[in-house]
């Protein structure tokens, strides 16, 4: 599946949420999920920077997120959808 998306994979696990970047994914801590939820009403550009900083904890992941964002259509729409999705996790 192309694009960026969050997925809840369970509860009471070490990682309950994963962030998909195309065919790859990275686990996301509950603390990071809560921080992103709290900041989900930021303007798109600022939320993107926060997302890349918190989820992309290595330069490789940061590059993967930005590359997938560029290749999957309108970046503003993708980030807006992610902002809504994170509030529902």
Residue ranges and their predicted role:
Residues 14-76:
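Acidic, low-complexity, intrinsically disordered interaction modules
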Residues 2-19:
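Amphipathic, interaction-prone secondary-structure segments
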């Amino acid at each position: 599946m192309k694009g960026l998306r969050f997925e809840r994979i369970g509860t009471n696990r070490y990682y309950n949420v994963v962030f998909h970047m195309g065919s790859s994914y990275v686990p996301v801590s509950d603390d990071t999920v809560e921080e992103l939820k709290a900041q989900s009403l930021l303007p798109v550009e600022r939320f993107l920077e926060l997302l890349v900083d918190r989820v992309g904890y290595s330069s490789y992941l940061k590059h993967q997120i930005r590359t997938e964002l560029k290749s999957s259509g309108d970046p503003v729409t993708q980030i807006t959808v992610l902002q809504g999705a994170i509030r529902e996790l």
